[in-house]
């Protein structure tokens, strides 16, 4: 299995709740390497590039059920405050990160996942309040999404290769 890179965003609610350090520590403790990181406050145009139009198809069922434009709500949520964007690298990195993050809906996330431990708003509560589920974090869904998202959030020269102790112990003979 090759090392993969994936984009992770700590969304405004995670930043505002001072969870950045705790979340970073979990990824590093799992042997994932931070190869790029920055804090950014997304504007409308940038948020719409992240939540790109081709993702609208995924949200059709939610829109039917709740009568809300999911993409517009996600864009609004991403613009609410600063975001910490990072690129993580590791063996099977995309799947490892997604497993650590947990379900999209915090109340459905297992204990021990980032959302299961730090987020608590259910989709029913969020819908009753007419807000997006505050789920703290975004992680690329697959290799294709990771490639698109990484190139949106980072230039090539902002991503770095280096060895960690984990690399030396686990990957060098």
Predicted feature residues:
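Non-catalytic terminal and connector segments of soluble metabolic enzymes
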Residues: 1-173
């Amino acid at each position: 299995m090759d090392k993969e890179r994936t984009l992770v965003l700590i969304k405004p609610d995670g930043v505002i709740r001072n969870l950045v350090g705790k979340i970073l520590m979990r990824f590093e403790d799992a042997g994932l390497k931070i190869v790029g990181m920055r804090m950014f406050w997304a504007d409308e145009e940038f948020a719409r590039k992240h939540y790109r139009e081709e993702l609208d198809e995924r949200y059709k069922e939610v829109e039917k059920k709740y009568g809300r434009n999911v993409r517009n709500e996600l864009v609004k949520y991403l613009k609410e405050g600063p975001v910490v964007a990072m690129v993580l690298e590791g063996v099977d990195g995309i799947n490892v990160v997604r497993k650590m993050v947990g379900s999209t809906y915090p109340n459905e996330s297992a204990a021990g996942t980032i959302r299961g431990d730090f987020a608590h708003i259910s989709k029913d509560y969020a819908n009753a309040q007419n807000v997006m589920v505050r789920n703290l974090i975004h992680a690329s869904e697959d290799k294709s999404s990771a490639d698109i998202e990484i190139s949106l959030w980072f230039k090539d020269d902002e991503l770095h290769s280096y060895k960690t102790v984990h690399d030396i112990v686990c990957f060098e003979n």
